[in-house]
Swiss-Prot record:
The lineage of its organism: Eukaryota, Metazoa, Chordata, Craniata, Vertebrata. GO terms for biological process: negative regulation of protein secretion. Interacts with SEC5. The interaction occurs only in the presence of magnesium or manganese and is stimulated by dCTP or GTP. This is Secretion-regulating guanine nucleotide exchange factor. One of its GO terms (cellular component) is cytosol. Keywords: Cytoplasm, Guanine-nucleotide releasing factor, Nucleus, Phosphoprotein, Repeat.
Amino acid sequence: MARESCASETVSAAAVLFAWGANSYGQLGLGHKEDVFLPQQLSDFCQAGCIKSVTGGGGHSAVVTDGGDLFVCGLNKDGQLGLGHTEEVLRFTICKPLRGCPIRQVACGWDFTIMLTEKGQVLSCGSNAFGQLGVPHGPRKCVVPQAIECLREKVVCVAAGLRHALATTATGSVFQWGTGLASSGRRLCPGQNLPLFLTAKEPSRVTGLENSTAVCAVAGSDHSASLTDTGELYVWGRNKHGQLASRAVFLPLPQRIEAHYFQDEKVTAVWSGWTHLVAKTETGKVFTWGRADYGQLGRRLEPPEAQKPVEQDSSLAFQGPQNSVPSPLHCLTGATEISCGSEHNLAVIRDKCCSWGWNEHGMCGDGTESNVWTPTPVQALPPSPSRLLLVGCGAGHSLAVCQLPAHPVPCQDLKVTCPLPDDTENTESQGAVDRDRLEGETISDLNPDRTRNGGGGCESETVQ
């Protein structure tokens, strides 16, 4: 999923959209359903307006224009495109039911979509099997965006995970709905009464954040995170892969990640994949932590047998200390845009796009299906003087917006002459990773490119 850009970062109308990666449902908007391993330019897309944000979900994509129009494509089995039907859409199509209702931000979940209007109202469509639409007595699916009436406060940010969603209000509160975290919580916290916001099918205020003012929130598959106006990061939910930087296997209430993990700097932005997190601090440093077996963290870790033993309470054990501790990724210092898919990532640094992580469907854009272990330039995107402006991720696909020069340079056989600092050759190590194994997290009846789903990101403009 993607960080939603604010209106002040609107991309010029001359910008063009590129898409690549998993495409089993037409989520790339290219008019077919074949995976694409190199970025492909979408012709004549969205000429009437500027592109403000790009993002994706389990098998669908969404683009918001400067004028507030929403364009969608891809999987639509549960009505997640909001078009009034359930047929797949292979090219970006304007969401007509929202005409006259300008959209500010979109968050794509696994099989549902959350929209935020310019007036601060939240809409939803798609699957409601786990209460993720925030309409407790509504139908099991909704094919047209509907307002979440019980969320009466003005909202400034929305996020969508696998089976839950969040909204941050103008007053700094966070609301959560959808039962995506409830099953893990009951299993990992036996005998405990879970807070209402973990089990609610309508927006419920997240308790434990009363003494802070939230500016945004993000969602993973089984976890959530919230960033405050003072640069503090709170996390809650499942911690199987160390993504909560805690010894607990499950955090039912928000817990602050200590500032020393970020070298005592304030956090200004956070993004979430399915089981990993990325944060940026006030000086532009980028930190990653969480699941790492597909290269999600952009750095190679020592194998467990090579790590020094660390004393831990076995009842509170979580995956080894290397991946559970936020660590700086020096080659991304100063990145202006970052987006997390389910297990892959995109970043914009010095007007160039870099990718790393899971690459089974070519979503890293290097022309292969081998995982990418360190941030690596996407060479097939247009070179200088073109500028990479926006990036966005779905579960297993990628989107990018480039500003092309007046006379575009051909994209074929492009070479990057100045590799990024810390950029190292990515060697294939798939023998050590079974790409079809999801450690018990597989969701039945899903095609491979829908087996992971990212959670999106947010950036604070108020941290001082």
